């Protein structure tokens, strides 16, 4: 059934725009250049406002998710990477449930990737329509059909650009993937801004700076009671404070520490005697994929809940999914869930919120740990990183595990890889929850994504350096 499904969509995949694989090896300097160009295009799109919108000042239901989804309110990057990640989530669940079967051949993998791209474009159109029709840019009846269509076209073209930029890097022209690059850039930008923002906010205590570090020096300079000034700088509510910054640095350090956890399986060459090596199985075997897919799941649930609550406010089933309230204190207007399923799947705002509503905290912990472990374990089956796939790769390289025949390698790898995937996903979820409870800037999920992505780029850089010979050869 799976192959028939992939064959069915093959004609549609043929008309999709595609980046061709490079015909030659791309040098490191060229990869850096293409990565920089990709990032520049993304940042420019983040600053270009959508033409035709009447207003983008309404409460933002996706405020908490924008950092993770690399989206920017009211701009071409309104949707961010959400369509790509959502299509990946859908295809993974379909493949994991054996509704579609993905073979080991390059043809099947190419069809699977094409189907993912096709779904990404369909989801882009769907999300654009939902955003416009729910009144995020003004009343659709007042804007008119022409303006609504124009906004949808802009969002679709921007979504297509993101898809192609991601494919450009994944095909080998740049470093890493577009999704990772955009997420890390957005999160790091948010952390730096929350630490050093010169924007002033009027609070009940007077005018304060948004940036935590600037606010610290401002409060010390303007308050006569220095102890009280320090207390305000460390514990102030609704604005970034020094404790949030310390929690962020602490989570960075913890995640980097866990990145080094791995099991090295001894392997040897089947062709040359005396040639030994190791195959590392990391604790974070599937890296940040579980948390990205979990974020996509929650963000789409938010979209559906917000759309239904706008149209059918007061309906029992809609309220069961989520009820929303607006908040404007300490920043831009944002909508947040106050009851229903969406509320229990959203992170508590602080450790104080955990104590106020322990049931909310408990459900959130179970959801985060369970979903991350599930996504991590199912991802290895569709991404070519299962025990069977690894054994096949080792066999192609004429490597075998020491003390095991080729036929028993899959069984031995099965002892480690599924466990590492599930436990690694569990740890990813646990670290994200810890960061949320500590109040880290950019959300626990955001911090975790930033660290894992930066670490991935560090590993890519080291790999390129070893291939080129020296850092001097890399840069000059």
Swiss-Prot record:
Stretches assigned to the Lumenal side: 54-76, 139-144, 194-240, 310-354, 442-445
Record localization: Endoplasmic reticulum membrane
Parts of the chain that traverse the membrane: 34-53, 77-96, 118-138, 145-165, 173-193, 241-261, 289-309, 355-375, 421-441, 446-462
Keywords, sorted A to Z: Developmental protein, Endoplasmic reticulum, Membrane, Protein transport, Translocation, Transmembrane, Transmembrane helix, Transport
One Gene Ontology biological process: protein transport
GO cellular component, one term: endoplasmic reticulum membrane
Pfam families: Plug_translocon (PF10559), SecY (PF00344)
Sequence ranges on the Cytoplasmic membrane side: 2-33, 97-117, 166-172, 262-288, 376-420, 463-476
Topology within the bilayer: Multi-pass membrane protein
Self-association state and partner proteins as the record states: The SEC61 channel-forming translocon complex consists of channel-forming core components SEC61A1, SEC61B and SEC61G and different auxiliary components such as SEC62 and SEC63. The SEC61 channel associates with the multi-pass translocon (MPT) complex.
Protein family according to the UniProt entry: Belongs to the SecY/SEC61-alpha family.
Functional note: Component of SEC61 channel-forming translocon complex that mediates transport of signal peptide-containing precursor polypeptides across the endoplasmic reticulum (ER). Forms a ribosome receptor and a gated pore in the ER membrane, both functions required for cotranslational translocation of nascent polypeptides. May cooperate with auxiliary protein SEC62, SEC63 and HSPA5/BiP to enable post-translational transport of small presecretory proteins.
Stated name of the protein: Protein transport protein Sec61 subunit alpha
Gene name per UniProt: sec61a
